Amino acid sequence: MFSQDFFQKLTLPDLDNVTQCIRGLSRSTVISMGAIAAATTYYVAMRPKALPPICDLQMQSVEIPGGEFIHQSVLLNGDNLLTHFYDDARTLYEFFLRGARVSNDGPFLGSRKPKCAYEWMSYKEVMERSENLGSAFLHKQHSKTTDANIGIFSQNRPEWTIIELACYTYSLVSVPLYDTLGAEAINYIIDKASISTIVCDVADKVKMVLECVKDRKHTVKTIVMMATPSDELVGRGELAGIHILSLREMEAIGKANYRRPVPPQPDDMAVICFTSGTTGNPKGALLTHANIVSNCSAFIKLTQVNCPLGPGDVHVSFLPLAHMFERVVQGVMIVQGARIGYFQGDIRLLMDDLSTLKPTVFPVVPRLLNRMYDKIFGQANTPLKRWFLDFAFRKKEAEMSKGIMRRNSIWDRLVFKKVQATVGGRVRLMITGAAPISPDVLTFLRAALGCQFYEGYGQTECTAGCTMTMPGDWTAGHVGAPLPCNNIKLVDVAQMNYLAINGEGEVCVKGPNVFLGYLNDPEKTAEALDAEGWLHTGDIAKWLPNGTLKIVDRKKHIFKLAQGEYIAPEKIENVYVRSDAVAQVFVHGDSLQAYLVAVVVLDPDFLSAWTKRTMKVDGSYDALCSRADVKAAILKDMVRLGKESGLKSFEQVKAIYIHSEMFSVNNGLLTPTLKAKRNELRQYFRSQIDELYAGINKS
């Protein structure tokens, strides 16, 4: 504390009298003045600086005149949508060439063995391997015009990207497969895309393909395994008329039969990405080089000023490469000459991978963020710890509201440093998408992690994203403005009174990132793309006053209750899962019933702490799930959250069933992209739903 003498004698003297003034001060006052001067100098030098917004954050999109209520990014110069960012990078092959050049043949793809450091391949090494592999594909009679589709059935690893780049180098098309689709769907994709060569990472996937084509007519001629296949496996392949060999053998064939690259054109096909959907067979979205380049370029356009990426950046690859979200992020990293480090293949070891890799770019999905959030608050298990965590968060949140995003505040050092260390301690850019995220979770983790943290929205049919939050806008509860590569309009959903004239309706997207259609499926293509080229997403949204978009629900999931009110179930579910004790919710209703009911899965990691805190009740997970008083308390908490979020009375559930097993891909209740399979959930819980309604009708 400064001395009273200092405050009494502190004045603003003329410069001519400064020496005389100082001589008249006591020694303690002079020391105090020196201390405060030093502190002031330090503060001026180190004070946090707000990121300058790249646009007026109160007007992030503009409406195009014409009466169709079409919105466009304010980052565009004129009406032309963004097709590419770099003139020398208009295809994914050119992305790779540019990355190799700007990195000066720097490290590119990295992997690690357990408890070891990452080992890196350079851009030149990857180029050589991809050209050898691509030459082998051509030697096997693949070409741009004949038998162009190459199946990739693997977890994320460097070889995945080498195969993909081999396809791009020789104008071939990659077709990702993933085991969570199930054998029936993989069978369907192989036939639909007429795949003759499939590259698998492990023997189990080779066996799965062999089972898929067993005792039937098929197109598969070659299976390439990333490891060395056993003699027994090779023999099984021969019985099915399939040549099975290792990736190294395939590369050796290409080296011995080298072909010069056959660069693609922007409008050439790059990927056939099969989307799982919640019903029916997978649909193969046809995506060109121009589609993917425009989407990557839009991301670069948004981040180039405040968070430019380059060869010094490192991306951790763990989200499935079979999905376009991860592919677009990797495309951005490649064209900037950055590094990509792959996780070990076990999500339980991800934190160890992050600690070793120390990434600067970290794409995530809401499910992981929810777990991080729950874990942090689960550790604040005393009133004092919770108060201090809330206090530190509010201080960081206040800085964020001014556009300040940093990791060196006193609150970072005291509270959030360990949180930041869990993701490697160097992350400066994060992006989440693929599913809705709670505004509370996003805001807290933005503050805790202290990096530029964006939220995007889109789907495979528009490559990956069509909106993204702007740098400097760290508010939550929306998915940002249209990307510079596409326009967005909302169209009427009259039965729910969502009208475009009111800034509400179904999201429609048009631009160079919108796909060509579904492989050999004109009927489904016509459902998705209208005559003017607008992609109808099936999502309902509304424009906010600042030109950002807020997603409300899925159009096809809307249903009507007996008294005529329309219900958007996902909107309600997204409210209820904010309850600390709730992990998953399935809201059900139909036109024969006047009320909603729900199946609720409680969070095994946090239920016990929640019941202790709110009910003074303890017990095992199964015991707590079976208690009537716990069920009543959970329902009460859900209804409370519903009221706070503005749900109408008919949107609140009247009864719940507590289920103790998580909905998952393995039990058939979630899609591979972790979306609820509503028809399957309805059938699976039919008897419990009927009992809930019977109980309501009795009371």
Map each language-model feature to its residues.
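Conserved ATP-binding/catalytic segment of the ANL
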Residues: 496-502, 506-561
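Conserved AMP-binding A3 loop
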Residues: 120-124, 270-297
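Gly/Ser/Thr-rich phosphate-binding loop
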Residues: 44, 48, 52, 242-247, ...
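Structural core segment of the AMP-binding/adenylate-forming
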Residues: 2-69, 169-249, 635, 639
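Conserved AMP-binding/adenylate-forming core of the ANL superfamily
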Residues: 84, 88, 105, 109-144, ...
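Conserved AMP-binding/adenylation subdomain of ANL enzymes
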Residues: 293-317, 321-413, 426, 448
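Conserved C-terminal "lid"/linker of ANL adenylate-forming enzymes
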Residues: 559, 584-586, 635-699
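Conserved pre-ATP/AMP-binding loop-to-beta segment of ANL
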Residues: 104-107, 241-245, 251-274, 281, ...
